[in-house]
């Protein structure tokens, strides 16, 4: 994406915690 590592961290966090 365009947001770089910051967005990736949020996406990874959501996947680990299975949140929407």
UniProtKB/Swiss-Prot annotation:
Transmembrane segments: none
GO biological process, one term: defense response to bacterium
Intracellular or extracellular location(s): Secreted
UniProt keyword Secreted present: yes
Keyword terms, alphabetized: Antibiotic, Antimicrobial, Secreted
Tissues expressing this chain: Hemocytes and pharyngeal tissues.
Region described as Disordered: 1-20
Function: Bactericidal against several Gram-positive and Gram-negative bacteria.
Protein name: Styelin-B
């Amino acid at each position: 994406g365009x947001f770089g590592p910051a967005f990736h961290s949020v996406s990874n966090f959501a996947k680990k915690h299975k949140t929407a």
